[in-house]
């Protein structure tokens, strides 16, 4: 007779899926979570039952791919960072070679992404289990948000005199953009400037009149 410990271990071990089925389940759960975030605007109250119901699978199916809701939200957050990077890259590629125009484009793209996908934007920085800056920006190119920040850092460097350290300015731009997004959400009645005007004024304050 198997021991109680062995039985318990067997019951909690994730089952293997047929080849290809696991990937489809993984993708469908992330997609379902993304749809619910778009509809709800945040992850508050988002449940395993709601996600699996949207994905058309049983609640227990989630545990075949993820340890729980926190791990699923981390996966959705990672994918959202990739989407934000793609969104900013597309804005950059649509510009010419003018450094200020390129920085304007990716700064606006950052804000537009947050406006269009508020639920995804919120979990970028508030996902359960995240270890702050170490995991977001990472070390040795491992951070999930490093591509996004590197775009801003490189574009900032192009607007500064050669040899200048772009890090302090890039951090100030990032925190200001994040603050603009966050405050507009909680203070919608305040007379906020248009995104384009705000970004232009922000850059003028740092780099002077273009």
Predicted regions and their residues:
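Short secondary-structure transition hinges
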Residues: 112-154, 182, 189
């Amino acid at each position: 007779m198997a021991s109680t410990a062995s039985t318990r271990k067997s019951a909690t071990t994730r089952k293997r899926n047929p080849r290809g089925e696991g990937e489809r389940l993984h993708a469908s759960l992330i997609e379902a979570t993304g749809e619910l975030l778009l509809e709800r605007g945040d992850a508050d109250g988002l449940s395993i039952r709601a996600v699996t119901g949207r994905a058309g699978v049983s609640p227990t199916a989630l545990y075949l791919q993820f340890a729980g809701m926190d791990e699923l939200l981390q996966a959705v957050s990672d994918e959202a960072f990739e989407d934000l990077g793609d969104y900013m890259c597309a804005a950059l590629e649509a510009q010419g070679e003018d450094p200020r125009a390129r920085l304007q484009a990716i700064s606006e793209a950052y804000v537009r992404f947050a406006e269009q996908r508020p639920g995804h934007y919120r979990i970028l920085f508030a996902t359960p289990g995240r270890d702050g800056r170490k995991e977001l920006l990472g070390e040795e190119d491992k951070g999930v948000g490093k591509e996004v920040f590197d775009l801003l850092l490189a574009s900032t460097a192009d607007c500064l005199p050669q040899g200048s350290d772009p890090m302090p300015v890039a951090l100030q731009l990032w925190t200001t953009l994040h603050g603009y997004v966050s405050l507009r959400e909680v203070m919608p009645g305040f007379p906020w400037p248009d995104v384009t005007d705000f970004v232009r004024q922000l850059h003028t304050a740092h780099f002077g009149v273009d």
